[in-house]
Amino acid sequence: MMTSCEGVDFINNDDVTWQYCPTFAPAVLFAVLFSLTTGSHIVQAFTFKKTFSWVVIVGGAWEAIAYGLRAAGAKNIYQKGFGLPHHILIALAPLWINAYVYMVLGRMVHFFLPDKRCFGISARRLTVIFVCLDILAFLTQGASTSLLNSDTASTVKIGINIYMGGIGLQELFILIFIGLAVRFQYKMAIVERTEHSKGPWRPLLYTVYATLVLITIRIIYRLVEYSGGLHSAIATNEAAFYILDATPMFLALFSLNIFHPGRFLVGPGSEFEKKPKKAKKRKNKNKSGSGKWVLDDDGQGHFEELPLDERV
């Protein structure tokens, strides 16, 4: 059922979840654009065999679904089943893209640097730390979404403060991470003077920088938007939303299509190796009495079959 926005009071009407009348055409356009870039990421994940790319695929899918809901909401502004999920997905989707960038640089440190470390921290640990920090920002922002859609002004204000705190945390983590990226770039410059690099790394690193800048643009926009409340001039400006939120996120995903990590992280060491199982755990798997576990000098060990007359 198509509804008109004519005469609707978007400030005082609790039956609508929009700050203004959403436009149908641009919502459809970005739903298609995000669907295309996400579809490309799915194909590339299989082509380059980068299983960790599921993270960016989720982010792109959330964006595509969000704009599909926005298009549907433009036809029926009173249907909260369109508005509420849209706001949640739009708020949280960029955090998946952010996490993916953290994972990409972690693998670059692991693959390109001989010591596989940055600031003395292993590549695997760096990745885990920043993904966990991203999850913290995700949970903080996620906790605010239900409050932002409350009918009570005081609750909405609390939601705004929590959300701004969450994206503030996200930006703080990004700035720290950029410091790590700069350190990686410095170490790679030294590596290139002393030995051959495993392959081109600058295009992928510059893509990491660009993606973080695009996410930062979106964060600054959101901070300015919510600092004036849900009905400020910028919060009710749809053009600003598409220019400073939708477009940066699409460009971030698209740039990761063009300079996909799978094009640069190729061969042995391009992925984190699976951690070896501990000898004790392996020993417990052999309770049949047909052999014994012998510990090697490297701490790993091997299983030796016992003669038939010595088996339990």
Pin down the residues of each PLM region.
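Juxtamembrane membrane-water interface segments of multi-pass membrane proteins
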Residues: H41-F52, K75-Q79, M108-A123, T152, ...
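Extracellular loop 3-seventh transmembrane helix
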Residues: G83-L95, Q141, G159-I174, G199-P261
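Transmembrane alpha-helical segments of multi-pass membrane proteins
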Residues: G60, R125-C132, P200-A210
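Seven-transmembrane alpha-helical bundle of G-protein-coupled receptors
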Residues: A27-T37, S53-A66, I90-M103, F130, ...
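Helix-to-loop junction signature of class
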Residues: E63-I77, T140-D151, A181, I215-G229
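Intrinsically disordered, low-complexity terminal tails of fungal membrane proteins
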Residues: M1-T3, Y186, I190-P200, P261-V312
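Cytoplasm-facing ends of alpha-helical transmembrane segments in multi-pass membrane proteins
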Residues: S35-I42, A91-R117, I129, I135-N149, ...
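Membrane-proximal first intracellular loop
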Residues: M1-P94, R107-H110, R117-R124, V128
